[in-house]
Amino acid sequence: IIDVVEMPTMTEGKKNKKQVNGSQIFNEISVRIKKFDKKDIRVIIEQVSAMPGQGVTSMFNFGQSFGILKGICSAMQLPMYFVRPAKWKKYFNLINSEKDASRTRAIEIFPYFSSELSRKKDSNKADAILIARFYHETYKMND
């Protein structure tokens, strides 16, 4: 894990809805990978799907964000690996736990990221860290 950052977003439309900022994602990835050989890079993405009770608009926006990330990585010719939420959560004993439990677990494993995970709303970044760790510990051996 070379870094952890917030997903870049931008506001759009009259209602100032936030959406993923694709060009900024490209920039963030480009800056972080330029010193690495592409054969040594892995992009690990959570393989998510629609959730029960999620509205149509939310579902569409969620899928659009997922597609933007896949499209950027494809265009950059970066290898992508997908991990289902149940797999990585089971691995870290986080099934049926509070959302904040992943933040606590990530800090236990990577104390040097504690300043990046100090707020409750940083649980999404903690999830990303744990997904990367899960891949590294389970799938990387098969590469």
Regions found by a protein language model. Give the residues of each.
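Phosphate- and other anionic-substrate recognition elements at nucleic-acid/protein interfaces
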Residues: 1-143
